[in-house]
Design a protein with these regions (language model features):
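Core segments of cupin and vicinal oxygen chelate
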Residues: 2, 8-53
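Conserved catalytic-core motifs of GNAT/GCN5-like acyltransferases
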Residues: 27-37, 101-105, 126-130
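Short beta-strand segments enriched in hydrophobic/aromatic residues
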Residues: 11, 62, 127-129
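Short catalytic micro-motifs in class I SAM-dependent methyltransferases
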Residues: 6, 124
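Vicinal oxygen chelate
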Residues: 12-15, 52-53, 65-122
Length: 131
């Protein structure tokens, strides 16, 4: 049986992305340079959250190429205990606003909202009922 290991997204500014994901509670774990034929091609930055190790990999390619998000990409979903507090912290630290205000889904009190990370990847924040 397979186990989930990590999600990788390409980034354009390692420091900006690191600061953003740390504001969401991720911990920087390690970085790994990818060198081929003596040329530094990419640096992978790994992040952990809670007791889950190295679940997010941010890849910076050193050749300066740009990327377009594919049409098949949806979003990364993250659970938060305090949706309003998380949004306030992201606004203060990064000027990030949700796509629309948080809203309730279903009848159980769960609230969600969507936002974009510094490289325009869509992030869903989920506050389950009861915090």
């Amino acid at each position: 049986m397979a186990t989930f290991l990590h999600t990788m997204v390409r980034i354009t500014d390692p420091e900006r992305s690191r600061s953003f994901y740390e504001a969401l509670g991720f911990r920087f774990s390690r970085e790994m340079d990818i060198v081929r034929s003596g040329v530094l091609e990419a640096t992978n930055y790994f992040f952990s959250i809670g007791d889950q190790e190295n679940v997010l990999e941010l890849t910076y390619n050193h050749d300066g190429r740009s990327y377009k998000l594919g049409t098949g990409y949806g979003h990364i979903a993250l659970g938060v205990a305090d949706l309003d507090g998380t949004l306030a912290a992201l606004k203060d630290a990064h000027g990030i606003e949700p796509e629309r205000p948080p809203y309730q889904v279903g009848s159980g009190g769960t609230r969600i909202c969507f936002m974009r990370d510094p490289d325009d990847y869509r992030i869903e924040l989920i506050e389950r009922s009861g915090g």
